UniProtKB/Swiss-Prot annotation:
Co-factor binding details: Binds 1 Fe(2+) ion.
Alphabetized UniProt keyword annotations: Hydrolase, Iron, Metal-binding, Protein biosynthesis
Identification of the protein by name: Peptide deformylase
Cross-referenced HAMAP family: Pep_deformylase
Enzyme Commission numbers on file: 3.5.1.88
Lineage: Bacteria, Bacillati, Bacillota, Bacilli, Bacillales
Gene Ontology MF terms in the entry: metal ion binding; peptide deformylase activity
Source organism of the structure: Macrococcus caseolyticus (strain JCSC5402)
Active site: E155
Positions that bind Fe cation: C111, H154, H158
Amino acid sequence: MLTMKDIIRDGHPTLRAKAEEVPLPLSTEDRQLIDDMLEFLKMSQDEEQSRKYQLRSGVGIAAPQLNHKKRMLVIHFYDEKKGDYVTHQLINPKIISHSVEKSYLPTGEGCLSVDEAVPGIVHRYARITVKAYTPDGEEVKLRLKDFSAIVAQHEIDHLNGVMFYDHIDKADPMKVQKDAIAVE
């Protein structure tokens, strides 16, 4: 079981390294890792488990955050509009197309690897198409928008050694780009 102790923090060199492609089919070790990542997110969102194991709630996690330079990520959150969970375990994800239109979270973004709040607006593509593989080796193309697109871009950034705060305008952190859409 993964805990907060397994998550490396801002300043660790792995967070700034480009992660490597993962060979398919997945090794037993890689399969265990991506399944543990999903379990962590589920437990972090469960009030009782989160309190018991002192987990910070997360909606996404990438293998580099666990000090594995591998192109794997997991997204898991409850989508109120759909009335269901959005869950993706992705191997070697690539953004193959995106909208011109940008979106952002008005409250800013956070990260399991960054302990302190970093105020500022992070602009992301409003819609993206991601090509990736499932843990079973099946190729998938996901069309994501709104919160799903923001979370996916945040996690894919981790695979490329980019932190969310790298996108914040240093001169005017709360500046919203013209025509950018707020995602509530």
